[in-house]
């Protein structure tokens, strides 16, 4: 248990992931929530880091090769700071998570920046192509079983690669 007053709950509330890239449009209203630290020093991050949230509209959409939405822009806002990467972007109409914040352009102020989020459907399709299962399949799986499979099937090859670059010729354990 990580709680002083008792065990953790069996389940936690969550927002579903939007897997249909055809439901993401310029102008859609979204909620951004993060822990931006762009204007805090190292000591302040430890003591004064607070959640920030704001609403925004999707300003632009981008595709990589598929012709479908892979990345979208939500413009500049209070969340457009370092430390926001990995934070959720939630569709205000459906409550579904559209994607996660991954990049921001540079700018003197947050209003001058352009914040970007990668679409979950793109991540899920990339995972399916690369590792054989979607993001939702991974998230709904058994973490202990996945860890055991990783330890058995992937870890030995990674340790071999690491040992090639270790001064001692030994992989870290």
Regions found by a protein language model. Give the residues of each.
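Solvent-exposed, polar/charged alpha-helical surfaces in well-ordered, non-transmembrane soluble domains
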Residues: 15, 25-28, 156, 160-163
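Short glycine/Trp-rich loop-beta-loop segment that forms part of the substrate-binding cleft
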Residues: 17-50
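Active-site region of chymotrypsin-like
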Residues: 2-15, 42-137
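PDZ/PDZ-like groove recognition
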Residues: 125-173
């Amino acid at each position: 248990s990580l709680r002083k007053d008792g065990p953790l709950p069996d389940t936690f509330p969550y927002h579903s992931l939007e897997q249909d890239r055809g439901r993401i449009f310029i102008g859609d209203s979204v909620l951004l929530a993060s822990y931006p630290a762009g204007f805090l020093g190292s000591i302040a991050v430890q003591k004064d880091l607070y959640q920030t949230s704001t609403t925004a509209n999707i300003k632009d959409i981008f595709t990589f090769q598929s012709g479908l939405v892979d990345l979208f822009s939500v413009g500049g806002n209070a969340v457009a700071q370092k430390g926001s990467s990995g934070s959720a972007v939630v569709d205000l109409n459906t409550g579904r998570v559209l994607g996660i914040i991954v990049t921001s352009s540079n700018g003197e102020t947050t209003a001058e920046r352009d914040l970007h989020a990668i679409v979950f459907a793109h991540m899920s399709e990339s995972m399916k192509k690369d590792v054989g299962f979607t993001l939702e399949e991974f998230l709904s799986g058994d973490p202990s079983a996945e860890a055991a499979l990783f330890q058995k099937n992937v870890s030995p090859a990674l340790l071999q690669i690491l040992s090639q670059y270790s001064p001692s010729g030994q992989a870290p354990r």
